[in-house]
């Protein structure tokens, strides 16, 4: 998956450490380190540290703690999808069909976002419907038109090469 260089606290700078960004504090947005720190991460997403780089002595404006450059990759989200959309490798539009069910990832994924299912890990029944418990990645933001068309790729991508998903 996509790798990004960002800054984390010295305590978090350990290969294998996982963390989730719940929100970005307002104080961060005025910091000179924001573009290489929180500015590279998305709220609601989980990340895993895959490489630690040498510290350059940067300090956090909020905690005054030492910040260390690391390479992170987005960790998959675990959530519910209707059984008819739960196929490994498929890209679908998240429609919040599981709203109100425990395990529904609506706090992490917005209606209309494209997600790529990477693994099916189980099944769950909620509100009279069957859902698959899946691991997935968010691959694109919701379309500006607010379209709720569910799409799966059945043929070659028409997207320009720079916008195609990499396997």
Curated annotation (Swiss-Prot):
Residues 145-157 have a biased composition (Low complexity). It comes from the Archaea. Residues 142-167 are annotated as: Disordered. Belongs to the UPF0179 family. This is UPF0179 protein PAE0681. It comes from Pyrobaculum aerophilum (strain ATCC 51768 / DSM 7523 / JCM 9630 / CIP 104966 / NBRC 100827 / IM2). The lineage of its organism: Archaea, Thermoproteota, Thermoprotei, Thermoproteales, Thermoproteaceae.
